[in-house]
């Protein structure tokens, strides 16, 4: 399983989330997942909404174009981003390495 896949105009990412981090950042590859650190705590969906907002900003899309496909209640998530206008360097490098 690749951490980042392209399916048509969607980008599918398998993420490992680190909540309550000191800052928001895409850390890099962690096993077969992309590790993302976010400052929000994992309480009452705060981490999920913060993750969606952060990813929307990084990929320059509306929040409605980012959805959690799987793993809403855990640290391991599958996220789909519809028609990203920008791809951060960390993610772009993973896509380039796939072939």
Swiss-Prot record:
An annotated GO cellular component: cytoplasm
Cystine residue pairs: none
Family listed: Belongs to the UPF0235 family.
Protein name from the UniProt record: UPF0235 protein AHA_3661
Organism: Aeromonas hydrophila subsp. hydrophila (strain ATCC 7966 / DSM 30187 / BCRC 13018 / CCUG 14551 / JCM 1027 / KCTC 2358 / NCIMB 9240 / NCTC 8049)
């Amino acid at each position: 399983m690749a951490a980042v896949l392209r399916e048509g105009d969607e980008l599918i990412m398998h993420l490992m989330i680190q909540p309550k981090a000191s800052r928001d950042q895409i850390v890099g590859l962690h096993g077969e997942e992309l590790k993302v650190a976010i400052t929000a705590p994992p309480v009452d969906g705060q981490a999920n909404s913060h993750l969606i907002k952060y990813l929307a900003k990084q990929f320059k899309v509306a929040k409605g174009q980012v959805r959690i496909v799987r793993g809403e209640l855990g640290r391991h998530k599958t996220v789909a981003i519809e028609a990203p206008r920008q791809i951060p360097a960390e993610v772009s490098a993973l896509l380039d390495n796939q072939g």
